[in-house]
Each structure stands twice: as C-alpha cells, then as structure tokens.
C-alpha cells in the first residue's frame, strides 16, 4: 500500500484514541508520580477502585495535558505552525494555572516568554542550564498532537523539533520529542509488527541523531559509555528486551530509565506500548491492550504521569477509541474538551492530507 493510502486510512477514532489515551495516562499516572518503586498490585487495586467510582472527573491532569492543550489550540488557530503563537499559549497556560506541576526550569522559560524583553521565542530555552538547554521530557510529553495534525513525516519531524525547542534546547530534549512524535505517526498507519515499527524509528533517528551529533550531550548528562546515537541505542535495547521473555522490570528501568530526561522516558514509553501488544502474565486479561499499556507503564515507577501519557498516546493512536473504556474515560478531568479537540485535529489532518 502506498504512503498516501496508509495516511488516508487514519480515522477519527484513532485521533480520539490518541488524545484520550494521553489524558488517561497523565491523570492516572499522576497518582503514582515520583515513586521509584511502584507495585503492580497497587496499580491494579487503584484501577479496580477507580472503575467503581460513580463520581466523574475525580482524576486531575498535570502540566503534561495543560501543555498538550496549548499545542492543540495553537495548531487549530495557526495550521501552518506558528512558534510565536505556540510560545505565547505555553506561557499564558502556565500563568493561568501555575500549580499543574511544572518544573522549576521551564517556569523560568515561561516567565521570560511573558516578558516583552524577548523577541526571539527560542532564546529563553537556549539560555537554560548555562546555555546547554534542557534535556527533559517536557517537549515529548506534549508532542503527540503534531503527529495527529500533520500526515507528512517531514512535517512531523520539523514541527516536533520546533515545538520542543521553545522549552528544550538540548538535542536530547528535542530529539526525544521527535522520537515520540514519530512513534505516534507510525502507530497511526495501521497494523504493525514490533520489529518493523522499531526499524522505522531507528532508521529515522539514525539520520536525525547522526546529523545533529546529539550524542555529545549524552556523554555529559547520561551514561559515559552511551555517547553515540543515544536514542538509537535505546531503541536497539528495546529490540533485545522484546526478543526475550519475562524481562524483570528492574532491568527495564536500569537500561531504559523512568526519569524526567527524555532519554530516560521516551524509549520506556515506546517499550511499554510494544510490550503490551501481547498479554502480560501479571496483568489480568480483562484489560485491553490500551489499558494494559497504561497499567504497565505506571508500574515502572518514576515519572509515571509523563511515561504513561506518552505510552497512552501511542497506544491510543494504534488501537483507537474502542479501547478507551467508559469507566476510565469518565474518571478524567477535561475528557469532553479532549474529545472536542480530537475532532478539530482530525479535520486539520484531513485538510493537510489534501494540500499538495
């Protein structure tokens, strides 16, 4: 099937699934954020009680969803992508609700963006950390909507990079966002095989990382022996894990990470999605693949809201809205607005598909 044929097959259900999956991951993951040791039975008990809850909107979203909403609003208002508009929306969203869990570093970026002193919207991010920029996962956590708005893979890469660079100037930060956007993009294309999916991601990231030499940052900020094509290295490790059976979660965390760095979380989200395409012996089969993905990603501990929101976006894009169950959907704040946004993003996607 041609690329155009595959793109034309993307459905509203997939776009809704991606945004709702991301929201579910954020809201549910936030309940466990910051704990290095999350026990799976605790996550399953949390889910069981949640499904019995009669009151709607009992789980609240974090900065992950707040920033995702800002991205969506900007894309809808400025379909050709406008970094000035997006930066303004980031800063204003923070100013409106500063208690959603923002990190101290990005708060300084937002405050500078609110100042008339800065005419270059990328400058505040470049000034972070003595000019090295942030390598955190904040650009990746909000980037799924880029893949949901633009069918062309080069647009996905370009706009994922630019949207992330508004707050994350380190190649490790914005390349993590590109990888997450690509994962959503490829998940939208229909039935996939895990190895093929990973090979597609590795192929794109080899070109991107090789061209930008982001590995120089990996030596400073991460493991000294992982200095060449860091995201590709993690993707290859995922292939190794998937080829094995019953890999301990401790090994997943040790090798892929569960932290706030993009390198320590985006590959973990991708692994969670791919691992949960098949049954997990520790997670009851009554849960579907999307639910299993979110449960599993939370059980890895660490930055649970962000890893789960990224994994949820990928899984939702692949499985669609059918796997977003009513009891889970009802539990989340802003679910109605999220579904409304999905319709508008899908309309934008279809318009972009028709653009020569």
Swiss-Prot record:
GO terms for biological process: DNA repair; negative regulation of necroptotic process; peptidyl-serine ADP-deribosylation. It catalyses: [(1''->2')-ADP-alpha-D-ribose](n) + H2O = [(1''->2')-ADP-alpha-D-ribose](n-1) + ADP-D-ribose; 1''-O-acetyl-ADP-alpha-D-ribose + H2O = ADP-D-ribose + acetate + H(+); O-(ADP-D-ribosyl)-L-seryl-[protein] + H2O = ADP-D-ribose + L-seryl-[protein]; alpha-NAD(+) + H2O = ADP-D-ribose + nicotinamide + H(+). Changing residue 64 to N: Complete loss of activity. It is found in: Nucleus; Cytoplasm; Chromosome; Mitochondrion matrix. Mg(2+) 1 binds at residues 26, 62-64, 305. Mg(2+) 2 binds at residues 33, 303, 305-306. It holds the Pfam family ADP_ribosyl_GH. SUPFAM superfamilies: ADP-ribosylglycohydrolase. Changing residue 305 to N: Complete loss of activity. Gene3D superfamilies: ADP-ribosylation/Crystallin J1. One of its GO terms (molecular function) is ADP-ribosylserine hydrolase activity. Binds 2 magnesium ions per subunit. The record marks 33 as: Glutamate flap. The protein undergoes a dramatic conformational switch from closed to open states upon substrate-binding, which enables specific substrate recognition for the 1''-O-linkage. The glutamate flap (Glu-33) blocks substrate entrance to Mg(2+) in the unliganded closed state. In presence of substrate, Glu-33 is ejected from the active site: this closed-to-open transition significantly widens the substrate-binding channel and precisely positions the scissile 1''-O-linkage for cleavage while securing tightly 2'- and 3'-hydroxyls of ADP-ribose. Activity is inhibited by calcium. Its cofactor is Mg(2+); Mn(2+). Substrate binds at residues 63, 132-138, 168, 260. Its main location: nucleus. Monomer. Belongs to the ADP-ribosylglycohydrolase family. ADP-ribosylhydrolase that preferentially hydrolyzes the scissile alpha-O-linkage attached to the anomeric C1'' position of ADP-ribose and acts on different substrates, such as proteins ADP-ribosylated on serine and threonine, free poly(ADP-ribose) and O-acetyl-ADP-D-ribose. Specifically acts as a serine mono-ADP-ribosylhydrolase by mediating the removal of mono-ADP-ribose attached to serine residues on proteins, thereby playing a key role in DNA damage response. Serine ADP-ribosylation of proteins constitutes the primary form of ADP-ribosylation of proteins in response to DNA damage. This is ADP-ribosylhydrolase ARH3. It comes from Latimeria chalumnae (Coelacanth). The gene is adprs.
